[in-house]
């Protein structure tokens, strides 16, 4: 007998053993087929969230499956240094002590960051272990460790030497609070209610006439270089080429024609400010205007405008109106609007809904800023230095396109190819510099004249310059730069290693759609460019894990579920503290608290890692977002318990008994049709689950396994086995015990990729009993292979007859309202010999006996069922009055519930305004109540006949 199922106990025991025994490491036998998988490195600042648990369940499931298929598997884990996120965390810690990074200086500050990383950096990898990830921890990397730093430098230098990295002035997303450029992924578009200001721009040769320009950003007016109109807009064609007076400045700017302008938007006249708007930048570039920068890096108005051409060359600047100099952009907006009003330039202000770009870390409004940055050229052709391959001579962007167009990289689901191509066809040069201290410092040095020397180290730079006293570039690289190299930086590049031969390309990348461009495309570019190979063969895109209402999980919204809390459980008070700390709007705390109490009135009970993993696997349908339902996790906790209890039953009936293994393996085994049926179902399940794993359909694998184990094995076969063990001869009992063990052991191996802990624990006991312990761990045992010869059609046909008979008897009991504890005799009238079936009925349907008769006995009360040509009748005395009273009371109760639910659904506006999932639940509840009522009414009618 097994002890009670205790997930925590078996999880810690087995994971430690797996890791200590080195089971996660590839054996580097290059004659074996390889399977490798790329882990999206989580931020070193981070803790495990539901998205991690979701994609790591899929990745680990694949790794365990292919390991059991005999592959040389490598799942290399690592963490990302997460430049901005990490620097912010440490700066906030220092701020709490009234210290800034500038007080410490760069070197001391970086020491603090490394100290923090050593203390906190292991949290997420320990949590990955809790989920059961069988990653090779001996190969764990950090994107700023020495090996990765060396690779980053080598890649940067080579790209620079190939003419693919340059420094120039470009428009970037600028976070004035952080004081750095940020990527598009770090910018959130927030819908806000703002204003649209309509401003008069008088004609220079006739100030009485003017065009009206509509803008949401009057504070950038000082940097205007033109007003654009649509060339097809007849209202303004006569003005194209004329000069306008720019309000508040006295400067004149031209009217230009550009198809970017929508005739029906605003007034049809758009101010063009190339240094402070991305769309205007493109318009300005087409018309070769100037770029006039009017803000400093803190987003305050400059005293003197900085002017450049589109080559980034400085031109003669000019003074800006003195009254605005030094004002923050929003203070400047207020002052300028007041001045426009006073001077008669402001026509009207209209309310306007707009999308405001905000930094996801600081919440500050992102400013398009013209700054000097380092870029990777996306469309330029390299000037040599590439490995021979089909990608040689192509630009980085063309390499990435070719990899997907040729089928070398496959997207699953395939529709993501369109998204990928859309991004690639509109690609811009990649801004890779960041004005931070934490990150890979750019390997470039400057002399006093501003000449730049890119080199692997300072000594090499000084050799290039022919002098000493060079100054190192202070900027660091975008975090995505080092992340883009992990497919080969983790396998020993630039050396030609066995790891590169065996594991590049990896088989699959499992990731969310939001980083297809930022990470996936860049890995394809860098890997094809430096190795001549694609980084991975398949890209499996999964959806986002949302809360039960379909909202994105966010700590700032208070709707996050911590996967570790699902594994270990957490009390209500601790859960409330967790969910109401760090809210974006602290005033929503009472609402969050109320919702939490409603959802988890007693906190979250312990589910165990296996139940969490099975839940995630069940959600893993291709590409769809997931609304996480806690009830489903509870259901899969019950499933694990069911497996445990089923194993207990099997052990009770097989331990120290003749099971047809070992010494009695040669003894005859008289298999019954249920034995042959369950073995046939096992082989069908092996086929289906193998197909599901190999096509990334973990949802189908989970569904198939659940149905087989719960319905076929536990609900049907175990119950039929009880009959065989009680009534069968020695040969029949031996066959049943043999089948019980054989099918259970194979099912445990089928389940192992999804639920590794419980399967390891049970397999260690079950496998030796059926001569199946071929390895020290289930994770090293071979995955089951289907044998179609064991699918016996006659056994399936016989099982269908038996299931129909049992279903008919159960329906009869239900129709007659016979309580579960009441036993009754069954009479079966049939010309066929049903002896093989009837022996199972008493135990399966709580009968005193099941008897085949030539004709059913006479009875006025007993209903008759027909099943496969046989007539069935239960003989039982019924107290009609008592049963009528009971059913009438039940009907009354059901009617009240129906009335209440119908009233709710017919309430005006409810079905349109209530959350869709609640409306669907109410409709499902209504259908269920109506079905119950119909059955009760049917029984009452029969009693009255």
Curated annotation (Swiss-Prot):
Top-rank EC class of the record's enzyme: ligase
InterPro entries: aa-tRNA-synth_I_CS, aa-tRNA-synth_Ia, Anticodon_Ia_Val, M/V/L/I-tRNA-synth_anticd-bd, Rossmann-like_a/b/a_fold, tRNA-bd_arm, tRNAsynth_Ia_anticodon-bd, Val-tRNA_synth_C_sf
Coiled coil: 879-945
Top-level taxon: Bacteria
Residues that bind ATP: 555
Motif ('HIGH' region): 42-52
Molecular function, one GO term: aminoacyl-tRNA deacylase activity
Localization per record: Cytoplasm
This enzyme's EC code(s): 6.1.1.9
Record-annotated disulphide pairs: none
Record-level GO cellular component terms: cytosol
GO BP term (any one): valyl-tRNA aminoacylation
CDD domains according to UniProt: Anticodon_Ia_Val, ValRS_core
Catalytic reaction(s) noted: tRNA(Val) + L-valine + ATP = L-valyl-tRNA(Val) + AMP + diphosphate
Pfam families named among the record's database cross-references: Anticodon_1, tRNA-synt_1, Val_tRNA-synt_C
Residue interval(s) of motif 'KMSKS' region: 552-556
Main location as per UniProt: cytoplasm
Keywords, in A-Z order: Aminoacyl-tRNA synthetase, ATP-binding, Coiled coil, Cytoplasm, Ligase, Nucleotide-binding, Protein biosynthesis
Family: Belongs to the class-I aminoacyl-tRNA synthetase family. ValS type 1 subfamily.
Record text on subunit structure and interactions: Monomer.
Domains (record comment): ValRS has two distinct active sites: one for aminoacylation and one for editing. The misactivated threonine is translocated from the active site to the editing site.
Protein purpose: Catalyzes the attachment of valine to tRNA(Val). As ValRS can inadvertently accommodate and process structurally similar amino acids such as threonine, to avoid such errors, it has a 'posttransfer' editing activity that hydrolyzes mischarged Thr-tRNA(Val) in a tRNA-dependent manner.
PANTHER family from the UniProt entry: VALINE--TRNA LIGASE, CHLOROPLASTIC_MITOCHONDRIAL 2, VALYL-TRNA SYNTHETASES
Name this protein carries in UniProt: Valine--tRNA ligase
Source organism (scientific name): Neisseria meningitidis serogroup B (strain ATCC BAA-335 / MC58)
Primary gene name: valS
């Amino acid at each position: 007998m097994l002890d009670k199922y205790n997930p925590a106990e078996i999880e810690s025991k087995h994971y430690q053993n797996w890791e200590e025994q080195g089971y996660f490491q590839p054996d580097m036998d290059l004659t074996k087929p390889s399977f490798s998988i790329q882990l999206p490195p989580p931020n070193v600042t981070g803790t495990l969230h539901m998205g991690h648990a979701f994609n790591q369940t899929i990745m680990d499931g694949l790794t365990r499956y292919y390991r059991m298929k005999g592959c040389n598997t490598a799942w290399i884990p690592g963490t990302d240094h997460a430049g901005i996120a990490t620097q912010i965390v440490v700066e906030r810690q220092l701020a709490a002590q009234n210290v800034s990074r500038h007080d410490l200086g760069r070197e001391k500050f970086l020491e603090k960051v490394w100290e923090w990383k050593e203390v906190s950096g292991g949290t997420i990898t320990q949590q990955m272990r809790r989920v059961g990830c069988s990653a090779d921890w001996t190969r764990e990397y950090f994107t700023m460790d020495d090996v990765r730093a060396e690779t980053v430098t080598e890649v940067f230098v080579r790209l620079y030497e190939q003419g693919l990295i340059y420094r120039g002035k470009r428009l970037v997303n600028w976070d004035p609070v952080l004081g750095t450029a940020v990527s598009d992924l770090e910018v959130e578009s927030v819908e806000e209610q703002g204003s649209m200001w309509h401003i008069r721009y008088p004609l220079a040769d006739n100030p009485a006439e003017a065009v009206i320009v509509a803008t949401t950003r009057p504070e950038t007016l000082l940097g205007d270089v033109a007003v654009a109109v649509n060339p097809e807009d007849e209202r303004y064609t006569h003005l194209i080429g004329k000069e306008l007076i720019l309000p508040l400045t006295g400067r004149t700017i031209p009217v230009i024609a550009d198809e970017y302008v929508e005739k029906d938007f605003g007034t049809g006249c758009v101010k063009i400010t190339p240094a402070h708007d991305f769309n205007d930048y493109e318009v300005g570039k087409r018309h070769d205007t100037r770029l006039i920068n009017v803000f400093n890096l803190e987003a305050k108005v400059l005293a003197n405008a900085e002017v450049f051409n589109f080559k980034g060359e400085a031109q003669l600047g000019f003074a800006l109106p003195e009254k605005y100099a030094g004002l923050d952009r929003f203070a400047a907006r207020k002052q300028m609007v007041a001045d426009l009003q006073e001077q008669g330039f402001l026509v009207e202000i209209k309310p306007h809904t707009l999308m405001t770009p905000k930094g996801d870390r600081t919440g500050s409004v992102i400013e398009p800023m013209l700054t000097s940055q380092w870029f990777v050229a996306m469309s330029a052709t390299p000037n040599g230095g590439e490995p021979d391959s089909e990608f040689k001579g192509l630009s980085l962007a063309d390499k990435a396109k070719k990899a997907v167009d040729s089928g070398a990289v496959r997207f699953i689901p395939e529709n993501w190819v369109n998204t990928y191509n859309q991004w690639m066809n509109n690609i811009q040069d990649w801004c890779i510099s960041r004005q931070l201290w934490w990150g890979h410092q750019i390997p470039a040095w400057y002399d006093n004249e501003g000449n730049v020397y890119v080199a692997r180290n300072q000594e090499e730079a000084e050799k290039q310059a022919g002098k000493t006293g060079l100054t190192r570039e202070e900027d660091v690289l975008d975090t995505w730069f080092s992340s883009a190299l992990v497919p080969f930086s983790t396998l020993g590049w630039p050396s030609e290693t066995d790891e590169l031969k065996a594991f590049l390309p990896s088989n699959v990348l499992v990731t969310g759609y939001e980083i297809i461009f930022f990470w996936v495309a860049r890995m394809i570019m860098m890997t094809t460019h430096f190795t001549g190979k694609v980084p991975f063969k398949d890209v499996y895109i999964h959806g986002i894990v949302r809360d039960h209402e379909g909202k994105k999980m966010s700590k700032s919204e208070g709707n996050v579920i911590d996967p570790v809390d699902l594994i270990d459980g957490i009390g209500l008070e601790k859960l409330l503290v967790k969910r109401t700390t760090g809210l974006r709007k602290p005033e929503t705390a009472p609402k969050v608290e109320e919702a939490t109490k409603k959802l988890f009135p007693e906190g979250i009970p312990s589910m165990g890692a296996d139940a969490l993993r099975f839940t995630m696997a069940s959600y893993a349908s291709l590409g769809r977002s997931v609304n996480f339902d806690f009830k489903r996790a509870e259901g899969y906790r019950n499933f694990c318990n069911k497996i445990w209890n089923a194993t207990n039953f099997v052990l009770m009936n097989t331990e120290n008994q003749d099971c047809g293994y070992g010494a009695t393996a040669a003894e005859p085994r008289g298999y019954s049709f249920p034995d042959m049926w369950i073995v046939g179902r096992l082989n069908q399940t092996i086929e289906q689950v193998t197909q599901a794993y190999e096509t990334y359909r973990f949802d189908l694998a989970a569904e198939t396994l659940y149905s087989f184990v719960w319905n076929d094995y536990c609900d049907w076969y175990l119950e039929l086995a009880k009959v065989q063990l009680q009534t069968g001869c020695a040969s029949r009992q031996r066959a049943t015990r043999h089948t019980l063990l054989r099918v259970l052991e194979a099912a445990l191996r089928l389940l192992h990729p999804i639920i590794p802990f419980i399967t390891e624990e049970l397999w260690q006991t079950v496998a030796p009993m059926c001569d199946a312990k071929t390895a020290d761990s289930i994770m090293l045992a071979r995955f089951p292979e289907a044998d179609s010869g064991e699918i016996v059609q006659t056994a399936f046909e016989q099982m269908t007859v038996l299931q129909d008979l049992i279903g008919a008897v159960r329906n009869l009991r239900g129709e007659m309202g016979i309580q579960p504890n009441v036993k009754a005799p069954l009479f079966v009238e049939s010309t066929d010999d049903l002896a093989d079936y009837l022996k199972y009925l008493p135990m399966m349907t709580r009968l005193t006996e099941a008897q085949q008769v030539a004709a059913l006995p006479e009875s006025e009360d007993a209903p008759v069922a027909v099943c496969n040509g046989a007539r069935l009748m239960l003989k039982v005395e019924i107290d009609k009055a008592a049963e009528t009273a009971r059913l009438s009371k039940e009907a009354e109760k059901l009617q009240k519930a129906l009335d209440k639910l119908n009233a709710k659904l017919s309430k005006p506006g409810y079905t349109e305004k209530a959350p869709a999932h609640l409306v669907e639940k109410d409709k499902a509840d209504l259908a269920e109540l109506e079905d119950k009522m119909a059955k009760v009414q049917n029984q009452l009618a029969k009693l009255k006949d």
